[in-house]
Amino acid sequence: MFQYEKDGPAIYRQSFATIRAEADLAGLPADVSQVAVRMIHACGMVDLVRDIDFTPGMVAGARRALRSGAPILCDVAMVASGVTRKRLPADNEVICTLSDPSVPDLAAKLGTTRSAAAMELWRDRMEGAVVAVGNAPTALFRLLEMIEEGAPRPAAVIGVPVGFVGAAESKDALADHPSGLEHLVVRGRRGGSAIAAAALNAIASEEE
């Protein structure tokens, strides 16, 4: 017989305690620290904290938006599926347009990826929304382009696409964007849908 922890809440408590003991969270505000713990929990890498970049008002702004009923816009279904609905403060709508039937033709017309083309279907929902990009750098680049073109501004953007082509650059573009968007990013190549969903869940509710 194997001896291992079987109690779910106890596993969470021990995991979060380990993260707080091993990760250098001292330089983070309390609200960002809570989100960082969840992000680290999703990937198992305590050094992720070194690459987390954020605007000071990001977490508070995103929480206000969610409490007011703002939708959550996700680049891929994996991010949307990772959102724990019971944590949402206003039964917020979670939207992913990547599987919309119009997206393949739109991508061909625009000469871009489906992930980037799917952003075009966000336009009427972007104002004051909470955006989470966890997979496709092209989606994050296109989001920034749309804002530069005059599209409505979201309340906050979680930008954590993962990969070797464009991921680091897209997150740098968000973090350094002159529009001053409220954002949370993981600089460099690391990121992913699980980290994006973890950040959303931590922002949605202050309860661990």
Can you name each region flagged by the protein language model?
Residues 27-41:
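N-terminal glycine-rich anion-binding loops that anchor highly charged ligand groups
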